Amino acid sequence: MHMNKLKILMLGPSESGKTTIANYLSESINIEEAGPPRPTQGVRIVEFELPNINVNGKNTNIDIELWDCSGDHRFESCWPALRVGVQGAILVCSPTTTQVATRELELLYNYFVSQPKLSAKQCVLFYNCTNDSDDIESLTLSSTFSKVSQVAINLKSGGNRLKIDFSNYITSVLQAINRYA
């Protein structure tokens, strides 16, 4: 099965860094150019090509449709539309959002991963560290997340690492889709 476009949702509490991560992955910005965060209104779709992804032993280019979703619950009425055709979910939280993150991520995982019957391999959690002393160990998640890959990211010191982690995640999504196709 040839997948040429993937619909990936980026979800998480407000002010966790979703838009900055989406912009960085799509190469819309250099991290040095990132201004102060502004709340996303509803959803913002960023499209870009991810080259040289290994699919069944062959390198291919994958078009990514990254849906940068607002963390504001006043847009919750849009959730059913966002979920249509979803093939993967990136959950994002940061040290500044850990207080609300546990409950919020559980809600988002249930609605956008469990209910549309995505596998845990089609989900990843990015813990957006804003400085080098931040530690993913400070995030306490339920057993729901035991099979979900959890990755600490730091755009300021490890942006290239994020791109590698993202490519690995996309490979995982493609493998899961091919397994259930």
Language-model features: where?
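TRAFAC-class small GTPase G-domain
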Residues: 1-181
